[in-house]
A protein has these predicted regions:
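Glycine/threonine-rich phosphate-binding loop and adjacent beta-strand/alpha-helix elements that clamp
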Residues: 1-217
């Protein structure tokens, strides 16, 4: 069967004090809705300086499971982490992220990566996804859905669940030059100012397919 019938689709909400840059920032991943009505995080996406691909379902020496700590120190990557788990957590099935976003680009990309943070703070990628958001100019935050690759992974006791949000994953995915032109036709790139909202009205979150443990009783 797929997905598993006993799957409990569980939303984990992103939250911060307005600075989710880098693991040392205030980005949090929680089961409760964010409380701050004006909360958001922002970053600048420059297509000339894309986030380099580090692991994932691609070819080459950087494919597969890869340490993410260097990527997470970039100023154009937002990082949200849970508390250390008190018991193992299995995630098996499809994964989606619902983000409420604003941008000043006519077209841009949004990327989400699910990460397992070990007790020594080493971070490893689990799966990721990307969405090309065209006709993106809006005055109010717009909901988007980023579909990540399905996975089957157990986060062990003492580990933390983390997601990274950015606007590029190159060269695995082609850069969006933020111009609205296709990759074939584009000749000029534009810098995009990106904003992610996490409020009671705009509760950005990732939905994990949690598999409850089977009791031995």
């Amino acid at each position: 069967e797929w997905p598993l019938r006993r799957t409990q689709y569980t939303p984990y909400y992103i939250d911060s004090a307005g600075d989710a840059h880098r693991p040392a920032g205030s980005g949090r991943l929680t089961l409760g809705l964010p409380a701050d009505a004006g909360a958001s995080d922002a970053f600048v996406y420059n297509p000339k300086q894309p986030v380099p691909s580090a692991g994932g379902a691609m070819l080459g020496p950087r494919a597969g499971v890869y340490i993410q700590n260097e990527i997470e120190e970039r100023s154009d990557v937002l990082v949200y982490s849970s508390q250390a788990l008190e018991e193992p957590l299995e995630t098996t099935g499809p994964i989606t992220a619902v983000l409420y976003v604003k941008t000043d680009a006519v077209s841009t990309d949004w990327t989400v990566k699910l990460v397992d943070v070990h007790p020594d703070s080493t971070a490893y990628n689990i799966c990721d996804g990307i969405l090309r958001h065209s006709y993106a100019l809006e005055r109010t935050p717009q909901p988007i859905k980023v579909v990540l690759w399905p996975t089957s992974h157990v986060f062990l006791t003492g580990h933390r669940i983390r997601i990274e949000i950015s606007s590029s994953n190159f060269p695995r995915y082609d850069r969006n030059l933020n111009s609205g032109d296709t990759s074939v036709d584009a000749t000029v790139s534009h810098i995009a100012h990106q904003q992610i909202y996490h409020t009671p009205r705009y509760p950005s979150h990732i939905v994990l397919p949690v598999i409850p443990a089977i009791s031995n009783r």
